[in-house]
Amino acid sequence: AVTFVSATPAQILVAGAGALEQAVVKFKVLAGTAPLANQAVTFSLTVNPGGVGLGSTGSTAPVSATTDANGEASVSVFSGTLPGPVRVRAELAGDATIFAESQNLTVASGPPSQRFMSLSVSTFNIEGMDRDGTPTTLTVRLADRQGNAVEDGTVVNFTSEGGQVASSCATRRVN
């Protein structure tokens, strides 16, 4: 049997975001509960959000490895330019019916870019001069440098030269 062990880290950022762009995905080959050493394993991508590399940056070709004394084999996954889930399939070389797929590996969008930021208000020039507490809604749209929506929970800070505004808020994806 082939079993998925881990993806470390479970989240990497899109290429060029200036943060971690590589994860190691590990599988284990077992005979019952005993680990099998020196077994050839072939890795392939089954879900690729765009540009993800297997074994090296940008390569989508299958990669082979041999299990160690613990029955484990691993492969490096490199982020591409699009965010989304990634799945790696590990199969026993010579018997494609014995396989497992990775879980919980994600390529996340990068930090926001000023180039892809917009700010809008529900009401311009509110009656704030002689009326206290007149509200308006501010909407901020953010994307990373490739135009991908930023992750939920990205914090936006506000300042005001006149009047009052909440000091910060966290993003929430709205379709």
Language-model features and meaning:
Residues A1-N175:
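The feature marks long extracellular or luminal low-complexity segments
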